[in-house]
């Protein structure tokens, strides 16, 4: 679309494994393929817990500020995240302030005024979902410190030159959450990179071999976080057995694989995995097996009916999507949810909760089922696929066609490039709150002092 190659810097807090990370990686790869220069700046990047493109040299990644703590005695996560981002951005301002045409910022908007004030680049902020709606306020101190943080999120997000969101659902929640932001967010649906999903299954990979089974696979892919409601899939699966919804010999021929991002540094990941395992074994009497990335390769026992796969790799994902008879997507009010799109492209029918983003991606009774978040209702839906009330193969084919027409990476990259070109040539908006500028100046001074002391 343009002969000019843009220099684009992506700023992302923690470049691990998750839907937000998948989106920014795909965005970076897509823009890079169109001839633009791309680099990632992040506060944390673990080569053993990341997407392949950030590890194999496809994308340049620089880590800054990882020496700062992620929490203070297990608390104040958001404040530490903001401080880490300030340090990262301070280093950019000190040494690379004129290196980029566009900053693509997502998840955390605290750095936007700093970039706005001290660089000449335009800022595109991608809102996966308002952070103020994702946090719990269980204590008085949490309520007290979240109040200014929430206001800061609204003010700093509004300073962006362009705001994009991942769905119509998120756009609606954005307008309700940030009434002072008059800019209308543009909807940019997350894509999937078809090339990454068209790879053949590598059955010689040891991490794939341990997953091989004669059982039929029901698959759930979600981070091990309580808000993802993974137990919905587990309870629905167990109900098939407990309520005799299918014959015992039929149930014995199925395995539920609960796969997802898992970080041993995150207490909730550790605790939630333990809770799910206890629920499966102690309440439902199901045989389980857990696979960690660091654990030695060992075949899953043949009688294991629930397998927990923590932080799977690309080869394992390819295998599981190839083997799965049904994909179970459990979160409610999910802002978008890339997993159902991945499943549909792999020709796997999807069961998802009938709220949030999946309502915009899954076609009910055509590419899968949209159901209330009720284990018994989900169990009935799973049973209906097992007894072939629904034609899973046909639904899978329809799902693949649907994704090919609406969620391709080239279409996403074209749209994103057009937004960036328009943004780069636009006249900067200098209007802003003086209080926010003051916050930006103080933040930069504070970050620079810390950074210089550390050096």
UniProtKB/Swiss-Prot annotation:
The chain crosses the membrane at residues 73-95, 434-453. Its EC number is 2.4.1.132, 2.4.1.257. Belongs to the glycosyltransferase group 1 family. Glycosyltransferase 4 subfamily. Coiled coil: none annotated. One of its GO terms (cellular component) is endoplasmic reticulum membrane. GO terms for molecular function: GDP-Man:Man1GlcNAc2-PP-Dol alpha-1,3-mannosyltransferase activity; GDP-Man:Man2GlcNAc2-PP-dolichol alpha-1,6-mannosyltransferase activity. It catalyses: a beta-D-Man-(1->4)-beta-D-GlcNAc-(1->4)-alpha-D-GlcNAc-diphospho-di-trans,poly-cis-dolichol + GDP-alpha-D-mannose = an alpha-D-Man-(1->3)-beta-D-Man-(1->4)-beta-D-GlcNAc-(1->4)-alpha-D-GlcNAc-diphospho-di-trans,poly-cis-dolichol + GDP + H(+); an alpha-D-Man-(1->3)-beta-D-Man-(1->4)-beta-D-GlcNAc-(1->4)-alpha-D-GlcNAc-diphospho-di-trans,poly-cis-dolichol + GDP-alpha-D-mannose = an alpha-D-Man-(1->3)-[alpha-D-Man-(1->6)]-beta-D-Man-(1->4)-beta-D-GlcNAc-(1->4)-alpha-D-GlcNAc-diphospho-di-trans,poly-cis-dolichol + GDP + H(+). Pathway: Protein modification; protein glycosylation. Mannosylates Man(2)GlcNAc(2)-dolichol diphosphate and Man(1)GlcNAc(2)-dolichol diphosphate to form Man(3)GlcNAc(2)-dolichol diphosphate. SUPFAM superfamilies: UDP-Glycosyltransferase/glycogen phosphorylase. Glycans are attached at residue 138. GO terms for biological process: protein glycosylation. It is found in: Endoplasmic reticulum membrane. This is Alpha-1,3/1,6-mannosyltransferase ALG2. Keywords: Endoplasmic reticulum, Glycoprotein, Glycosyltransferase, Membrane, Transferase, Transmembrane, Transmembrane helix. Pfam families: Glyco_transf_4, Glycos_transf_1. It comes from Rhizomucor pusillus. It is a multi-pass membrane protein. InterPro entries: ALG2, Glyco_trans_1, Glyco_trans_4-like_N. Gene3D superfamilies: Glycogen Phosphorylase B.
């Amino acid at each position: 679309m343009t002969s000019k190659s843009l220099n684009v810097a992506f700023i992302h807090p923690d470049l691990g494994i998750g839907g937000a990370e998948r989106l920014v990686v795909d965005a970076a790869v897509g823009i890079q393929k169109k001839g633009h220069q791309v680099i990632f700046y992040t506060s944390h990047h673990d080569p053993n817990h990341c997407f392949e493109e950030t590890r194999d040299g496809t994308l340049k990644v620089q880590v800054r500020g990882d020496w700062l703590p992620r929490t203070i005695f297990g608390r104040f996560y958001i404040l530490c995240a903001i401080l880490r981002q300030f340090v990262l951005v301070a280093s950019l301002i000190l040494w690379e302030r004129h290196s980029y045409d566009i900053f693509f910022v997502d998840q955390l908007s605290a750095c936007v005024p700093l970039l706005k004030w001290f660089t000449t680049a335009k800022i595109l902020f991608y809102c996966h979902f308002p952070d103020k709606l994702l946090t719990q306020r269980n204590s008085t101190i949490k309520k007290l410190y979240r109040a200014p943080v929430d206001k800061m999120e609204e003010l700093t997000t509004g300073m962006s030159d362009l705001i994009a969101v991942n769905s119509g659902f998120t756009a609606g929640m954005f307008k309700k959450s940030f009434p002072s932001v008059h800019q209308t967010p543009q909807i940019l649906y997350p894509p999937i990179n078809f090339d990454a999903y068209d790879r053949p299954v590598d059955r010689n990979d040891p991490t794939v071999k341990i997953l091989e089974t004669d059982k039929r696979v029901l698959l759930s892919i979600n981070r091990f976080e309580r808000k993802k409601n993974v137990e919905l899939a587990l309870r629905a699966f167990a109900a098939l057995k407990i309520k005799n919804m299918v014959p015992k010999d039929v149930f014995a021929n199925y395995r539920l694989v609960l796969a997802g991002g898992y970080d041993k540094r995150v207490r909730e990941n550790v605790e939630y995995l333990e809770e799910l395992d206890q629920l499966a074994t102690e309440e439902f009497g199901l045989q389980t097996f857990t696979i960690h990335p660091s654990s030695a390769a060992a075949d899953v026992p043949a009688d294991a009916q629930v397998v927990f796969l923590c932080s799977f790799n690309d080869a394992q994902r390819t295998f599981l999507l190839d083997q799965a008879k049904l994909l179970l997507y459990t979160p409610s009010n999910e802002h978008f949810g890339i997993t159902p799109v991945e499943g549909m492209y792999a020709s796997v029918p999807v069961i998802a909760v009938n709220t949030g983003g999946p309502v915009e991606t899954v076609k009910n009774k055509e590419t899968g089922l949209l159901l209330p978040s009720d284990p018994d209702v989900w169990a009935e839906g799973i049973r209906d696929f097992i007894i072939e009330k629904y034609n899973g193969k046909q639904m899978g084919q329809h799902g693949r066609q649907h994704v090919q027409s609406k969620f391709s990476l080239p279409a996403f990259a074209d749209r994103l490039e057009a937004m960036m070109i328009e943004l780069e040539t636009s006249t900067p908006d200098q209007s802003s709150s003086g209080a926010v500028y003051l916050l930006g100046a103080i933040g930069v001074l504070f970050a620079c002092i810390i950074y210089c002391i550390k050096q």
